[in-house]
Amino acid sequence: MTPDPGAFNHISVLSHELMAGLMLQEQGLYLDATVGGGGHSALILSQYPQTQVIALDQDIQALEAARAKLHDACDRIQFWQGNFSTYHPGELRFDGIIADLGVSSAQLDRPERGFSFRYDADLDMRMDQSQGLTAADVINTYSERDLADIFYHYGEERFSRRIARKIVSKRPLRTTSDLARVVASSLPAAKGRRRRIHPATRVFQALRIAVNQELQVLEKFIEIAPTWLKPGGRIGIISFHSLEDRIVKIHFRQNSLLQVVTKKPIVASEQEKRENSRSRSAKLRFAERVPLADEAES
């Protein structure tokens, strides 16, 4: 079935801050490691007529949406489908690299993708739908202990063991609604009522991270990506929860090729938070590629 690009509606976050921090070059080459619907790439391409972008995404629906959005600049952008951790630029070196992590609003808003408990759909959660493992596979085949560990480590869910025990007793679970109900029924009544978020929020986050191996691929990407930058080039990464942000922060500090630009993360303005609720948890960090001794002399 051909994806419908028009149905992939995603509002990019921290766009102004991202463009300012990249310090765009007139003839620069940029890597958008998570092109999504193409919002950030469109802004990069709009700055200068000779700027070029290589755009990656593992989600074919996102990639097709970006192709449609950026059609007028098709001579200045190349697309590649796959996870950013498996991309190889060859001899190319970039003036800037950006990544907007996590699940997009467009993915959450498409019921058939199975990311959200707001819709009744099959438990899927695959960003790359060609991969085998689904959320249903994890929920229905993993041991109680493994499920509890996933919920605790990836969702920071304090009732992880209680929830895992209930899930195992109720298996098989096939839909997002099935899972959300079981999670909600696992919590002590008073605790569930006092939560500011839906009782299943942390479990769904943890499950999505596990299905897509989000933290593992982020670590791999952030270790190799600095070698793709030209000296003076910048990498900017937007994260949406503390687990991602911690990885970005630590790797930026520890990588000898990088100098941290943002001592503290950049967050959305109050106006952007009002206009786009997804931006409330967004954190943007920048680092700059430092020249090696032989590069400084050349």
Swiss-Prot record:
UniProt keyword annotation of rRNA processing present: yes
EC number: 2.1.1.199
Coiled coil: none
The UniProt record lists the keyword Flavoprotein: no
Organism superkingdom: Bacteria
Chief location of this protein within or outside the cell: cytoplasm
Biological processes per GO annotation: rRNA base methylation
Pfam families hit by this protein: Methyltransf_5 (PF01795)
One MF term in the entry's GO annotations: rRNA (cytosine-N4-)-methyltransferase activity
Catalytic activity: cytidine(1402) in 16S rRNA + S-adenosyl-L-methionine = N(4)-methylcytidine(1402) in 16S rRNA + S-adenosyl-L-homocysteine + H(+)
Key words of the record: Cytoplasm, Methyltransferase, rRNA processing, S-adenosyl-L-methionine, Transferase
A GO CC term assigned to this protein in UniProt: cytoplasm
Residues holding S-adenosyl-L-methionine: 38-40, 57, 84, 100, 107
Annotated InterPro entries: RsmH, SAM-dep_MeTrfase_MraW_recog, SAM-dependent_MTases_sf
Signal peptide: none
Subcellular location as annotated: Cytoplasm
Function: Specifically methylates the N4 position of cytidine in position 1402 (C1402) of 16S rRNA.
Family label: Belongs to the methyltransferase superfamily. RsmH family.
Name used for this protein in its record: Ribosomal RNA small subunit methyltransferase H
Phylogenetic placement of the source organism: Bacteria, Bacillati, Cyanobacteriota, Cyanophyceae, Acaryochloridales
Gene field: rsmH
